[in-house]
Structure formats: structure tokens, C-alpha cells
């Protein structure tokens, strides 16, 4: 496509719609030569034909003037933006430059975490090694990561339970969750290695047991989780996704095979008293520590689960992580919230309490995620749905996966609820079946402690199914999904009268009406193309991408240019408007250019050669003899190749020079700056003889007040330039839009006047906007000449001699550009020059 549009008008046949359909079928649908749009021109006041003849010539001049001012505004806008583009680019590069490479830390953020962890290590190692030396002795040989990030629970038990005897049966759980999840590891395995390869991985398991948490620093779990996320981030997408499914299944299986007890802390509550592996209720063997390791904190650009992160957050008094924050670091999305694996159950209560009060409502936390809310309310909802005859097979149920996903995002972002993407019908059917089975079992079996544990485990599987389904999308898909989600949030919250963030200024668009035009016919009302009906008139073109949209959906601005006025008055309104823009542009551009010129001169003086640059930043007070009645100090510029000559002979240039008073102050590629002290009465003689020897004396007087004033002047100029830059750019954008809109209205006036002059009264013509294909311009001309050649027999054959190439009054172009139909060009390549 081209940046050039054509506006033509043809006399109406029986109806103007028929004229448009005939032309559109022949040029666009059959031969695909162009894209056609209806160009709406209202029913303007015609006046007399004599008035139209004179107005036609004036409109041609006005068209040229308006286009000139529009391009002038666009070009100056490009200059102003180009002036700041290099500095902005340098600032962005300086802010986004990567830090030094490191093997274990991929970015500066994690490098800082590493240093913080090392400081915690030195402090923690001293106290922890004295109190519990057995914790450190096991991992003393590891040096690749901070010691406080390694698993320290291979031989540690919870303080609430005695240590397991050495002759414990093999089916009993080990002392720590790390050993449960990775029995093959000598130091406590890790779930962080999600790939299927057997390459050695750094061992930095974080144990959530009470002993380790009591000794570890507050930020250990959070730091370890960050490092774990970085390790996971280096894996491929396919292995990450498959391993995530396996890991979630493993955690779900561990939780399913154990009951839930009421522990003294979050980790104890999340601990499935691992001694209950036989499926018992609340009290079995000795309950060791939590079987849910913090290695389940996956970073796959999806909502993740981590019991250790929540445990560390609940134990830490620093509150460094916010439970309700969606943090995005290094393009990796990590949800750090209260909705972890250990919190996906109902509110924990003792089994005896449930047995004695089976219908008591669970306690609801003040702030819960949608998953927690749906699970805490599911028991009552299931019974109510059964009594009312409702089923859970509806895919739009609030307990479905789609609703949970949508509510979860609503809860994280605190935005109005929106529909999320639909999952497959198979997932909906399986979810509905699972919920229906839960409802049936709820009413068929009394709520015993064993049934309650099974019911909670089913909800744990359901919640993990939600997280598992939310984690099966690759990283790139989540990035694009959240970008589109942000666009939806902005589009729902923004209105036409609000601030336009992309363009940086607030512009309230003028509402335009769409009058029924006798020249376009009643069937063309509100149509911008033969296939679509716009919901509302186009706004002002606030960006380059909106110029074609404004042009193809053009409608007359009834507020600025009322159609009750005569054509001459409308032309005068446009002329005054553009004249005002031109005058303001001259004033604003002159003020800004003067400010920029003064600032550039000062910058050149700071960065130029020693012959021209300002010496105030180079000299110091100790370089001068001040407040002396007889002595003075001069600054001399010496060519670099003659520096030795100066040091040898400067005392002999004239009399009364202080011996050995010269010293080198500054040098560049070509010159050296020296000072010399002498008597005031021989200063002029010294300058004369120094010039003869090609030594240049700079006129400089050291005055601290003047030097400070010079520095303040440059700071003031920079501040003034920054203050003027923003309003100037906004003014240029607004007035560029105003000038472009005025230009299109002038084109519409010219089409109307020329159509009346050619086709006569009553007004009956159809104006059409054509967007020609770049390779089909010549063929399009031939088709239009065949279609409308009968309107002018002289040019129907397309042969015009050069002798007849003369200007036609009122048209503004030669006969070589004359066609049997009304034709005007609209070129929008001014935007390319503006580089907005």
C-alpha cells in the first residue's frame, strides 16, 4: 500500500449507493486494484456559481498553505524529538546495562542477593556452628553456594518430636522432607532439577522444618526460592512443563496419603504427619517435619506454589515479601502469595472438633485467594446445590477451572472481573465429573474424620489441578497473555476523554455528527467502507498510525465548521486557525531554539579544544596569585610539541617573571595549559612576545562568584529546556492533529465545490476515498477512465498534447493531471518525515 490516497467524485446514477457499488465492484472486488471508502461530505450551502468559481481558486491556495503548515509542524516535531532521542537512548542503555557476568548469579539483582546471603552466612555460621555443630558438619564441603542456602536437615528432627531411632522400619518417613522427595541424595535431594538429565546440580535444598527455620536467617527461604527459580529458568520449556506435572503429582500423592493435623505453625500444619502413611486419622506415629519441600517453588512464568516461601514469610519479622504482590523480575513471572500448597486446604481444625460439630462453618480469613474461597465454601455450596436441584456440570460454574482462573487473576491484579480463556471441553467434563462425585459422596457418607481428610485431599487435588492447568503454557504465551491482559485493562478503564498515555497529552475529542448528505445519499450515512459500519466517528489522529484511520472514516466536524455557514466563511475559519498555529509555532520554536543554542554553546565550551573551551572547570584557586598589588597570573596555551621549549625559555620571554612559577594544569591531544606568574606592569609585553613564539595567552580572571554563576547558568538552561520540552511536544502533537484535520476538511471543500461546478445542480454526486495498490496505479487509472470517460470526451482517449499543458483556472494543476472525474491527492508521508 501507498502513503498516498485519492479522493474522487462521480455523478450519482439512480442513487449514490449504486454509483459507489459500481465503482467498488469494478476496481476492488473484481481486479483488486485498490481499497475504497465512502468519503462523507455534508450538505453544504452552495451559493451562486460565480461565487463557487472564485472560491475554487482560493481553496486551491488555502490547500497549499494548510499542507505547508502541517508539514512544518510535523518536521519541527521530528527535530525536537530527534534532539532528545540520543540522550534518552544513552540513559536507557546506562540504566539497563547488564552487570558483570557470574556463573551462579545471572543478573545484578541476584548478584546482590548473593552478597547479602554471604553476609548472612558469616554471621549465621558462627552462632549456628557453636549451638548445633552437627548441622554444618554434614555440608561443610560445599562451597559453590552460600551455606545458609543448603539443606541442613539430613540429620535433624522437629523439636516437637523425638528423633527417629536408627532401627526404624524402612516405610517410616525420614527426618526431613528433603529426604522424602529425593531419597537418592546424600545431603538431601532437590526438586529444583526439573530436567530429566543426570547432570550434577548444585545442592541447595531448603528445608522447611522448625529446627532449620529457627536457625536460618529471615531471608533464607526467599533467597533460596529466588535461586531455585533461576536454576529452573535455565531449563527448556518442554522439560520444565513435563517436570512440573510430575512434581505436582508427587506432592499431591504425598499429601493424599497422609492426614492433616493441627500444628503449631504453618509448616507443621502443612506437614502431613508423615507417620500416618497407613492412612490413619489425627494421631499416629511420631510426627516429624513437613513433607512439602520448598523446592516446589517453580519459576515457569506461571502461578507457582511454595510452602517454604509462605513459611519463611510467616516466620520472618522483616516482611520483605508482600503476600499480595505479583512480582515480575527478569521477564519471569513469579506469584508470591498466600495461596501455596500448604494453604490449599480448608481451614485446619482438629478431627475431634469436626466429629463433634460436623456442620460448623469453617473460619474464613480476611484476605483469601479465589481458590481458597472456593474451597472453604465448597462444602456448603455442594449441599445447597443438591437441595436446589442444581448440578456442578455447568462449565460456567463458579467452581470450574475457568472461573477459578479468572477469579485468581482478578484477585492478583485487583481489576474488574473478566472472562479468561476457555479450556478444552474434555477438561470441563472431567472437572464437572469430579465435582459431581464429590457432591454425591458428601451426601452419601457422614462427615467422619477419615472422610473429612479424604474430602480435603480431593480439594487439594482440585486446587493443584488448577495450578497445574495454569502452568501448562510456555513462557512466551504467558508473556503475550499478560500483555494482552494489560491492554484489556487499559481499554476498559480508558475513555475518549481520558489521558492518552502513548502520546503524552490530554485531548478531549470533539463529538461529530453524521448528517444525511444529499450528495452522498441516505444509504451512505455512517458508513466508512462497504462492509463495516463504525460504531462512532473517528477521533483526532493523535499518532501516525491513526492518520489512515481518520482519513478512511472521515466525518465532518460540525462543531468547528458548522454547515449552516457559507463556504467562504468556513474557508476563513480554517485560514484563521492555521494562521494562529503558524504564528504560535514561530514564537515557540524561536524561544526553544534560542535556549537550545545557548546551551549548546556552553556545552561546546566545556568539551572543545583548550583554545576555545571554558577554563573554569580546569583551574583551581591554588593555580593563581590572588589579592596581590604587584603580581598576577596568566594562563598560556602551548602547542604540545613545544611544551619543552616553554619550560626552558618562558623565564626569558620578558623581565620580571617569577622563576619556576609555571606548572602544567591540563593537556589535550594538541595543546597544553600552563600558568605563569609575573609582575602586572609587564603583562602586556609578555603577551606580545609570547604570541611571537606561538604561545597563546588566554584572557581569564579567577573569580569564584563568576565561576559559580557560570555553572548555575548552565544548570538553569538545562532546567529551562527540560521544562519547555514536554509542553512543546504536547503542543506540537495537538496542533499537528488540528492542522491535519483542517487539511482534510479543505480537501472535502474542494471536492464539493469542484463537483458542483462539473456536475451541476442539484447536488448529486458520490465522493470516494481510494487507497491504491502501489503496483496497480496505472491499471487503476485505465479502469477509472473507462468507467467515467464519457463525462469528458476530450480526455476520454487519454491523449493530451504537450502544447495543451496549461494551468486551468480554479483547479491548481495542469491539464496533464486533469481527469474526467474530480480528483485530488492526499499525501500522508509527512508523518515519515516527522518520525513521531
Curated annotation (Swiss-Prot):
<feature type="compositionally biased region" description="Low complexity">
    <location>
        <begin position="302"/>
        <end position="316"/>
    </location>
</feature>
<feature type="compositionally biased region" description="Polar residues">
    <location>
        <begin position="364"/>
        <end position="374"/>
    </location>
</feature>
<dbReference type="Pfam" id="PF03223">
    <property type="entry name" value="V-ATPase_C"/>
</dbReference>
<feature type="region of interest" description="Disordered">
    <location>
        <begin position="496"/>
        <end position="544"/>
    </location>
</feature>
<keyword id="KW-0375">Hydrogen ion transport</keyword>
<dbReference type="InterPro" id="IPR036132">
    <property type="entry name" value="Vac_ATP_synth_c_sf"/>
</dbReference>
<protein>
    <recommendedName>
        <fullName>V-type proton ATPase subunit C</fullName>
    </recommendedName>
</protein>
<feature type="region of interest" description="Disordered">
    <location>
        <begin position="302"/>
        <end position="403"/>
    </location>
</feature>
<dbReference type="GO" id="GO:0046961">
    <property type="term" value="F:proton-transporting ATPase activity, rotational mechanism"/>
</dbReference>
<feature type="compositionally biased region" description="Polar residues">
    <location>
        <begin position="319"/>
        <end position="348"/>
    </location>
</feature>
<dbReference type="GO" id="GO:0033181">
    <property type="term" value="C:plasma membrane proton-transporting V-type ATPase complex"/>
</dbReference>
<dbReference type="GO" id="GO:1902600">
    <property type="term" value="P:proton transmembrane transport"/>
</dbReference>
<comment type="function">
    <text>Subunit of the V1 complex of vacuolar(H+)-ATPase (V-ATPase), a multisubunit enzyme composed of a peripheral complex (V1) that hydrolyzes ATP and a membrane integral complex (V0) that translocates protons. V-ATPase is responsible for acidifying and maintaining the pH of intracellular compartments and in some cell types, is targeted to the plasma membrane, where it is responsible for acidifying the extracellular environment. Subunit C is necessary for the assembly of the catalytic sector of the enzyme and is likely to have a specific function in its catalytic activity.</text>
</comment>
<dbReference type="GO" id="GO:0000221">
    <property type="term" value="C:vacuolar proton-transporting V-type ATPase, V1 domain"/>
</dbReference>
<feature type="compositionally biased region" description="Low complexity">
    <location>
        <begin position="425"/>
        <end position="450"/>
    </location>
</feature>
<feature type="region of interest" description="Disordered">
    <location>
        <begin position="116"/>
        <end position="169"/>
    </location>
</feature>
<feature type="compositionally biased region" description="Polar residues">
    <location>
        <begin position="496"/>
        <end position="511"/>
    </location>
</feature>
<feature type="compositionally biased region" description="Low complexity">
    <location>
        <begin position="512"/>
        <end position="529"/>
    </location>
</feature>
<comment type="subunit">
    <text>V-ATPase is a heteromultimeric enzyme made up of two complexes: the ATP-hydrolytic V1 complex and the proton translocation V0 complex. The V1 complex consists of three catalytic AB heterodimers that form a heterohexamer, three peripheral stalks each consisting of EG heterodimers, one central rotor including subunits D and F, and the regulatory subunits C and H. The proton translocation complex V0 consists of the proton transport subunit a, a ring of proteolipid subunits c9c'', rotary subunit d, subunits e and f, and the accessory subunits VhaAC45 and ATP6AP2.</text>
</comment>
<feature type="compositionally biased region" description="Pro residues">
    <location>
        <begin position="160"/>
        <end position="169"/>
    </location>
</feature>
<keyword id="KW-0813">Transport</keyword>
<comment type="similarity">
    <text>Belongs to the V-ATPase C subunit family.</text>
</comment>
<dbReference type="InterPro" id="IPR004907">
    <property type="entry name" value="ATPase_V1-cplx_csu"/>
</dbReference>
<keyword id="KW-0406">Ion transport</keyword>
<feature type="region of interest" description="Disordered">
    <location>
        <begin position="415"/>
        <end position="453"/>
    </location>
</feature>
<feature type="compositionally biased region" description="Basic residues">
    <location>
        <begin position="116"/>
        <end position="144"/>
    </location>
</feature>
Amino acid at each position: 500500500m501507498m502513503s498516498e490516497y485519492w479522493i474522487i467524485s462521480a455523478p450519482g446514477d439512480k442513487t449514490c449507493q449504486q454509483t459507489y457499488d459500481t465503482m467498488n465492484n469494478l476496481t476492488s472486488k473484481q481486479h483488486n486494484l485498490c481499497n475504497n471508502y465512502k468519503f462523507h461530505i455534508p450538505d453544504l450551502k452552495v451559493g451562486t456559481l460565480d461565487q463557487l468559481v472564485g472560491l475554487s481558486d482560493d481553496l486551491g491556495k488555502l490547500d497549499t498553505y494548510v499542507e505547508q503548515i502541517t508539514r512544518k509542524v510535523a518536521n519541527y516535531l521530528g527535530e525536537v524529538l530527534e534532539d532528545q532521542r540520543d540522550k534518552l537512548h544513552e540513559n536507557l542503555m546506562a540504566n539497563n546495562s547488564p552487570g558483570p557476568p557470574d556463573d551462579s548469579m545471572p543478573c545484578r539483582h541476584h548478584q546482590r542477593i548473593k552478597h547479602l546471603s554471604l553476609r548472612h552466612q558469616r554471621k549465621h555460621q558462627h552462632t549456628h556452628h557453636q549451638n548445633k555443630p552437627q548441622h554444618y558438619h554434614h555440608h561443610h564441603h560445599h562451597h559453590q553456594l552460600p551455606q545458609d542456602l543448603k539443606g541442613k536437615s539430613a540429620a535433624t528432627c522437629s523439636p516437637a518430636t523425638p528423633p527417629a531411632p536408627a532401627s526404624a522400619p524402612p516405610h517410616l518417613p525420614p527426618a526431613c522432607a528433603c529426604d522424602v522427595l529425593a531419597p537418592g541424595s546424600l545431603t538431601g535431594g532437590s526438586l529444583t532439577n526439573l530436567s530429566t538429565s543426570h547432570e550434577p546440580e548444585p545442592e541447595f535444598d531448603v528445608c522447611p522444618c522448625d529446627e532449620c527455620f529457627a536457625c536460618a536467617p529471615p531471608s533464607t527461604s526467599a533467597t533460596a526460592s529466588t535461586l531455585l527459580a533461576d536454576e529452573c529458568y535455565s531449563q527448556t520449556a518442554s522439560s520444565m512443563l513435563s517436570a512440573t506435572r510430575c512434581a505436582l503429582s508427587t506432592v499431591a500423592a504425598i499429601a493424599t496419603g497422609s492426614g492433616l493435623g493441627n500444628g503449631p505453625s504453618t509448616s507443621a500444619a502443612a506437614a502431613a504427619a508423615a507417620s500416618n502413611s497407613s492412612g490413619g486419622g489425627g494421631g499416629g506415629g511420631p510426627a516429624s517435619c513437613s513433607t512439602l519441600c520448598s523446592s516446589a517453588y517453580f519459576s515457569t512464568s506461571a502461578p507457582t506454589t511454595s510452602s517454604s516461601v509462605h513459611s519463611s514469610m510467616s516466620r520472618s519479622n522483616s516482611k520483605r515479601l508482600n503476600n499480595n504482590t505479583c512480582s515480575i523480575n527478569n521477564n519471569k513471572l513469579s506469584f508470591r502469595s498466600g495461596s501455596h500448597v500448604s494453604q490449599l486446604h480448608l481451614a485446619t481444625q482438629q478431627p475431634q472438633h469436626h466429629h463433634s460439630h460436623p456442620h460448623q462453618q469453617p473460619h474464613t480469613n480476611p484476605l483469601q485467594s479465589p481458590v481458597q474461597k472456593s474451597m472453604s465454601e465448597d462444602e456448603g455450596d455442594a449441599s445447597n446445590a443438591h437441595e436446589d436441584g442444581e448440578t456442578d456440570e455447568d462449565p460456567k460454574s463458579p467452581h470450574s477451572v475457568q472461573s477459578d482462573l479468572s477469579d485468581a487473576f482478578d484477585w492478583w491484579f485487583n481489576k474488574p472481573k473478566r472472562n479468561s480463556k476457555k479450556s478444552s471441553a474434555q477438561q470441563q467434563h472431567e472437572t464437572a465429573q469430579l465435582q459431581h462425585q464429590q457432591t454425591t459422596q458428601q451426601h452419601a457418607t457422614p462427615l467422619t474424620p477419615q472422610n473429612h481428610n479424604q474430602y480435603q485431599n480431593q480439594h487439594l487435588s482440585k486446587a493443584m489441578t488448577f495450578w497445574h492447568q495454569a502452568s501448562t503454557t510456555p513462557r512466551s504465551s504467558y508473556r503475550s497473555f499478560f500483555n494482552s491482559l494489560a491492554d484489556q485493562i487499559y481499554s476498559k478503564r480508558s475513555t475518549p476523554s481520558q489521558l492518552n498515555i502513548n502520546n503524552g497529552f490530554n485531548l478531549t475529542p470533539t463529538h461529530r455528527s453524521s448528517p444525511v448528505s444529499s450528495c452522498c445519499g441516505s444509504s451512505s450515512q455512517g458508513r466508512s467502507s462497504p462492509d463495516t459500519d463504525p460504531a462512532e466517528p473517528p477521533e483526532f489522529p493523535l499518532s501516525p498510525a491513526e492518520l489512515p484511520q481518520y482519513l478512511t472514516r472521515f466525518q465532518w466536524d460540525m462543531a468547528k465548521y458548522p454547515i449552516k455557514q457559507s463556504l467562504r466563511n468556513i474557508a476563513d475559519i480554517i485560514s484563521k486557525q492555521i494562521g494562529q498555529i503558524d504564528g504560535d509555532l514561530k514564537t515557540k520554536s524561536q524561544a526553544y531554539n534560542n535556549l537550545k543554542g545557548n546551551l549548546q554553546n556552553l556545552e561546546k565550551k566545556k568539551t572543545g579544544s583548550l583554545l576555545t573551551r571554558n577554563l573554569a572547570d580546569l583551574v583551581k584557586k591554588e593555580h593563581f596569585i590572588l589579592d596581590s598589588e604587584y603580581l598576577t597570573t596568566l594562563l598560556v596555551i602551548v602547542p604540545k610539541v613545544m611544551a619543552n621549549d616553554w619550560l626552558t625559555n618562558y623565564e626569558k620571554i620578558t623581565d620580571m617573571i617569577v622563576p619556576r612559577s609555571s606548572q602544567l594544569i591540563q593537556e589535550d591531544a594538541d595543546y597544553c595549559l600552563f600558568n605563569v606568574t609575573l609582575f602586572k606592569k609587564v603583562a602586556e609585553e609578555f603577551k606580545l612576545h609570547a604570541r611571537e613564539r606561538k604561545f597563546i595567552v588566554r584572557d581569564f580572571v579567577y573569580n569564584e562568584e563568576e565561576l559559580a554563576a557560570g555553572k548555575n547558568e548552565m544548570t538553569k538552561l538545562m532546567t529551562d529546556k527540560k521544562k519547555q520540552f514536554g509542553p512543546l511536544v504536547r503542543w506540537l502533537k495537538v496542533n499537528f492533529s488540528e492542522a491535519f484535520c483542517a487539511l482534510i476538511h479543505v480537501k472535502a471543500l474542494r471536492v464539493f465545490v469542484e463537483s458542483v461546478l462539473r456536475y451541476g445542480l442539484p447536488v448529486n454526486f458520490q465522493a470516494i476515498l481510494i487507497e491504491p495498490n502501489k503496483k496497480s496505479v496505472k491499471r487503476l487509472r485505465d479502469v477509472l477512465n473507462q468507467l467515467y470517460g464519457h463525462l469528458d470526451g476530450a480526455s476520454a482517449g487519454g491523449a493530451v498534447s504537450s502544447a495543451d499543458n496549461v494551468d486551468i483556472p480554479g483547479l491548481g494543476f495542469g491539464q496533464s493531471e486533469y481527469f474526467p472525474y474530480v480528483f485530488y491527492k492526499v499525501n500522508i508521508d509527512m508523518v515519515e518525515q516527522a518520525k513521531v
